Amino acid sequence: GFAVNPSDPDEFNVYNDPSWRPLLQLAEERSDLIRMRSAVRSRSWDPYRTLSSEAESDELRDLVQFHRYVEDEWHCTRVTVRAGGRTLTSTTRRNAQVDTVWTTEHLLKSVEDLDAYLQLPAAFFAEQIDVTPLVEEDVRTGDRGIVMVDTEDPLCAAASLFDMGDFLTVAMTEPTRFHRLLEKL
């Protein structure tokens, strides 16, 4: 499936715990492998992925800020996006014991937030397609399995921007705005 790196010393990498090693080794050696890899960002809406690319620009850096911190047993990330005269914020957190990122505050909370988000420049949404990771993983996997192209669709990307109730409300009551969002993503 997804990329697992048990040698990564990050305290929030659940797979570096020694208890995982026998299971990971067994799965690697005794099962057909399905390696999920993408030729684009795994989450097209993620501003961190945009700014981490070689195509980053001062314009984009001025629009997006990240604050990473540890609170109790949680690794938290607060993202602030300045768009359309508004300040949009989201917060995620991840526990060191579970490989799940929980969104505790979604970026878009209203139709007005969506309107502001739609004013972001095209570079914010730009994708750099690179099939190299797929080819490299295919060579490593060999005849032990397959490489599955893992790319999200615009509908899932849009859903992740909102609380589910807000997402459904906007999708049903604001079809023109929602379609514009899907076109951007």
What spans do the regions from the language model cover?
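Catalytic cores of TIM-barrel enzymes
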Residues: 1-185
